[in-house]
Amino acid sequence: MFLARALHAVVLLSTVADGAAMKIPRSSSGAQKLTYSHYGPVPGESPLYSTYRGKTPPFPANITDPILPTRKGKPGVDDMVWQNLLSAEWAIFSFYQQGVETFNKTSFVEAGYPNTTYDRIQEIRDNEAGHLRIFQDQISDTSLKPGACKYQYPFNDPESFLVLSTFIEIASMTFLTGLVQMAKLPTSQGAMTAIAAVETRHEVWSLMDIWNVNPFSGPSDTVFPYANQILDLTNVSS
């Protein structure tokens, strides 16, 4: 519960519509194009999700509306897990995107951090954009694919941003390993494990390059068994 409360303190969600609007998701023609898995750059095939450098959000984060179901039928076996994860990923991506927009290379150098820090933050932002696309594709066409909310984060300088970044990466790894236990399909479990490995790399970079601490903490990381307690905090309509 401490982890859940702490993440709630990090991610302060503001309402983006009145109650009636929250019950009736609004989409757009641009968002509905995301139904097709090969629309736009494909994770694993496009370098966009590692090498993009720019202040504006990369695809698919430049399209923030929810994706409405395109056919009727029962939801996929793991749709709810992926929906919760996609909601959380929007919050995580938005954190890094705000960092990219707020700071620049000089901001971190003048604060005493390595001159590669801003570039690495952009790369992590790109990775998180790729996660958005992966999670969208994992949700079946019979289920809603969540869009973004508006997010506020308690950082006001490079140091407070990096502190929050480290915590978010630790929390991400923890609830992802917990979600693996909730997924029923082996393909879902494998995809979540692969994403958790990427989040761990982000965490290790932060611990070693930013804080100069030993990233080795034992033979196993923490598995948070109630991952939805964390993810539910990212759902503004709950």
Predicted regions and their residues:
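All-alpha RGS (Regulator of G-protein Signaling) helical domain and cognate RGS-like helical scaffolds
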Residues: 22-238
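Fungal secretory targeting signals
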Residues: 1-29
